[in-house]
């Protein structure tokens, strides 16, 4: 499964909504597709053969437990999210790391260049209630991060840029979560990760944080690293950082 080629729907009442999405993403409308974006009455999901339906979720109920793990998380120690700090998640994926950062009060802008993943993220944002919106400041732009950064004016530079590149596919095992398997197959390797890191260093106020496999050599020598069990967070400081 490398591409999603269709939009499906659970019942005929959802056909019009599914057709609009299919037109928007230039996909076919196919109610019987076994691999597709799948519209249900509750939410937009990703339907993949041999997997249960997958979807993005930004409800505070879901993420309050992860916040409860506190600042011991490598992600939090590396990014140091606090109320009002602006974080650009340049490779949003399922939006899970962005959601965790937002629970600590950060203002997080997600970028996602894959149109299918961007559609799933947008749907998750649209399902939030007022309490979710107040507690987690999340927004989304469906864009390639490199193009977005080139268009950014200096006054709009984020405090932190967070990058979680899709690395070369790991060995298939039960240890690789289904969401990661899907991203690996759908998106593939981010071969422009090095370019993105270098560009980010000239478009950020405080630091660039890169999530990378623990046993894999960093793309660039970091200024600092925070180790986890299977991943680490490499930290890069811009030359003229004031922080």
From Swiss-Prot:
Keyword Lyase included in the entry's annotation: no
Cysteine-cysteine disulfides: none
Similarity comment text for this entry: Belongs to the methyltransferase superfamily. RsmJ family.
Lineage of source species: Bacteria, Pseudomonadati, Pseudomonadota, Gammaproteobacteria, Legionellales
Biological function: Specifically methylates the guanosine in position 1516 of 16S rRNA.
HAMAP family listed in its UniProt record: 16SrRNA_methyltr_J
Gene Ontology CC terms, in alphabetical order: cytoplasm
Gene3D superfamilies registered for this protein in UniProt: Vaccinia Virus protein VP39
Name of the featured protein: Ribosomal RNA small subunit methyltransferase J
Main enzyme class: transferase
């Amino acid at each position: 499964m490398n591409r999603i080629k269709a939009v499906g729907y659970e019942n005929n009442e959802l056909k019009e909504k599914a057709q609009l999405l299919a037109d928007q993403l230039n996909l076919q409308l196919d109610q019987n597709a076994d691999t597709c974006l799948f519209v249900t009455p509750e939410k937009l999901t990703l339907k993949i053969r041999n997997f249960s339906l997958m979807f993005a979720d930004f409800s505070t109920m879901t993420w309050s437990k992860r916040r409860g793990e506190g600042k011991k998380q490598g992600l939090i120690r590396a990014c140091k999210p606090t109320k009002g700090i602006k974080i650009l998640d340049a490779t949003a994926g399922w939006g899970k790391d962005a959601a965790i950062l937002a629970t600590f009060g950060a203002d997080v802008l997600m970028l996602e260049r894959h149109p299918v993943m961007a559609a799933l993220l947008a749907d998750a944002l649209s399902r939030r209630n007022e309490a979710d919106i107040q507690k987690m400041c999340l927004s989304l732009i469906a864009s390639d991060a490199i193009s977005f950064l080139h268009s950014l004016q200096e006054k709009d530079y984020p405090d932190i840029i967070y990058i979680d590149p899709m690395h070369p596919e790991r060995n298939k095992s039960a240890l690789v979560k289904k969401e990661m398997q899907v991203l690996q197959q759908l998106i593939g390797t981010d071969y422009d990760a090095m370019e993105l890191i270098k560009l980010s260093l000239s478009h950020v106020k405080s630091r660039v944080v890169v999530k990378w496999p623990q046993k894999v050599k960093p793309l660039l020598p970091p200024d600092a690293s925070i180790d986890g069990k299977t991943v680490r967070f490499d930290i890069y400081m811009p030359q003229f950082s004031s922080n």
